[in-house]
């Protein structure tokens, strides 16, 4: 499960409109586009809240976003390798990630929680350790 703090979005959000003009440059943006309502694909087009935020940033700094759908478990390595200019996707800022990428200030923070079936209410960590219950999460 990932805490939603968006990373590496080019700290331009805090800059005045006149501070940057990228001259229409195309910015390649890596995203795991499977996280609605933040980023998802509908009718072959990347849509969502993050897409709208990036569109506004690009409007202000004169750039064109090019969304590159990428698997979550390799997204930071691909960014560090130069495959994109930035990553815009649900991201938890960690010390490990901070060593390989630069983070912007977060523009949204969403709480995390654990979901479980009603009939498993009151389950303990021992139930997971014994194999009576299973836990699923996303890699990366």
Question: Where do the model's predicted regions map?
Answer:
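Immediate post-signal peptide segment of exported/extracytoplasmic ligand-binding proteins
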Residues: 17-45, 121-122, 126-134
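Short, polar/charged alpha-helical segment
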Residues: 40-62
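Solvent-exposed, acidic/flexible segments
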Residues: 46-51, 68-72, 121, 136-140
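Acidic, polar ligand-binding/catalytic clefts
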Residues: 55, 59, 64-129
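Short, well-ordered beta-strand core segments
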Residues: 87, 134-135
């Amino acid at each position: 499960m990932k805490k939603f703090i968006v990373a590496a979005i080019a700290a331009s959000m805090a800059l005045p409109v006149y501070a940057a003009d990228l001259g229409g440059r195309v910015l390649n943006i890596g995203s795991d586009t499977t996280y609605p309502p933040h980023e998802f694909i509908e009718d072959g087009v990347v849509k969502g809240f993050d897409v709208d935020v990036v569109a506004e940033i690009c409007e202000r700094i004169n750039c064109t976003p090019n969304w590159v759908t990428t698997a979550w478990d390799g997204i930071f390595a691909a960014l560090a390798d130069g495959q994109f200019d930035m990553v815009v996707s649900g991201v938890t800022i960690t010390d490990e990630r901070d060593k390989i990428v630069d983070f912007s200030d977060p523009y949204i923070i969403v709480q995390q929680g654990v979901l479980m079936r009603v009939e498993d209410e009151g389950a303990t960590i021992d139930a997971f350790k014994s194999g009576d219950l299973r836990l699923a999460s996303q890699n990366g």
